[in-house]
């Protein structure tokens, strides 16, 4: 697989690289265990680049994101089509890199376990399955 490159908008800057976990829609409050970092669908967020197409839910979601970081089970970064204020506030509080503006194609092509590299300038590279 050739490296796929996408441009995104940095909201909370930082760099990250790791395996992707892909989620179409997520409410951090009620669908993510802040102690384990596992979603109600059984997907772990800890140590992964979370590609979450869209989010929804309560303002408590910001505190769940912060709790994930405090408990050592936060994602390395969060990539979204369009970040909402709840996720932005949570990532600012927790210092988790957050990028949005990724096109629908990104969420259609990236798969769980694909290695993703996020650069501070907003460049997102999908390196493919099992790439070091």
UniProtKB/Swiss-Prot annotation:
Catalysis performed (reactions): (R)-5-phosphomevalonate = (2E)-3-methyl-5-phosphooxypent-2-enoate + H2O
EC category: lyase
Thermal properties: Thermostable. Treatment at 90 degrees Celsius causes a loss of most activity, and treatment at 100 degrees Celsius results in complete inactivation.
EC numbers on record: 4.2.1.182
Active-site feature positions: 58 (proton acceptor)
Keyword Lyase: yes
Annotated Pfam families: AcnX_swivel_put (PF01989)
Pathway involvement of the protein, from the record: Isoprenoid biosynthesis; isopentenyl diphosphate biosynthesis via mevalonate pathway
GO molecular function, one term: hydro-lyase activity
Activity modulation: Neither the addition of 1 mM Mg(2+) nor 1 mM Mn(2+) has a significant effect on the activity, whereas Zn(2+) causes almost complete inactivation. Strongly inhibited by H(2)O(2), but not by EDTA or iodoacetamide.
pH dependence of activity: Optimum pH is 7.0.
InterPro entries: PMDh-S-like, PMDh-S-like_dom, PMDh_S
Function in brief: Component of a hydro-lyase that catalyzes the dehydration of mevalonate 5-phosphate (MVA5P) to form trans-anhydromevalonate 5-phosphate (tAHMP). Involved in the archaeal mevalonate (MVA) pathway, which provides fundamental precursors for isoprenoid biosynthesis, such as isopentenyl diphosphate (IPP) and dimethylallyl diphosphate (DMAPP).
Family: Belongs to the AcnX type II small subunit family.
Subunit structure: Heterodimer composed of a large subunit (PMDh-L) and a small subunit (PMDh-S).
Protein's name in the database: Phosphomevalonate dehydratase small subunit
Native source organism of the sequence: Aeropyrum pernix (strain ATCC 700893 / DSM 11879 / JCM 9820 / NBRC 100138 / K1)
């Amino acid at each position: 697989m050739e490296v796929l490159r996408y441009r995104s908008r940095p909201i909370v800057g930082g760099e990250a690289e790791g395996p992707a976990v892909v989620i179409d829609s997520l409410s951090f409050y009620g669908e993510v265990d802040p102690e384990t970092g596992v979603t109600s669908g059984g997907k772990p967020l800890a140590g992964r680049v979370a590609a979450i197409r869209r989010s929804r839910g309560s303002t408590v979601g910001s505190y769940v994101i912060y709790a994930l970081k405090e408990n050592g089970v936060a994602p390395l970064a969060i990539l979204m089509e369009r970040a909402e204020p709840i996720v932005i506030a949570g990532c600012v509080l927790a210092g988790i890199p957050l990028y949005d503006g990724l096109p629908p194609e990104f969420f259609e092509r990236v798969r769980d376990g694909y290695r993703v590299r996020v650069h501070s300038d907003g460049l997102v590279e999908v390196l493919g399955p099992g790439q070091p």
